[in-house]
């Protein structure tokens, strides 16, 4: 495997891992949510109590897509 393929594979891996682990709509600075999607005191917006379990299926699907993309990139 060429060095350029290794570099491309690692770059693909790290970019996709950053996308999988990102929490959309929330920016945390010093432990406080600065840019959250939920406005203060708005009872009409319901947020699941456990944010990590709510998107576990999409994380699983994205992880499988990452694995397939890396294997395809290595062998092509």
Curated annotation (Swiss-Prot):
InterPro entries to which the protein is assigned, alphabetical: Bomanin
Example of a GO biological process term: innate immune response
Name of the protein described by the UniProt record: Bomanin Tailed 2
Propeptide position ranges: 23-24
CC terms in the record's Gene Ontology section: extracellular region
Disulphide bonds in the chain: 33-36
Superkingdom, natural source: Eukaryota
Keyword line: Disulfide bond, Immunity, Innate immunity, Secreted, Signal
Primary site of residence: secreted
Role according to the record: Secreted immune-induced peptide induced by Toll signaling. Has a role in resistance to bacterial and fungal infections. The strength of antimicrobial activity appears to correlate with the overall level of expression.
Signal peptide segment: 1-22
Organism: Drosophila melanogaster
Family: Belongs to the bomanin family.
Subcellular localization, as worded in the UniProt entry: Secreted
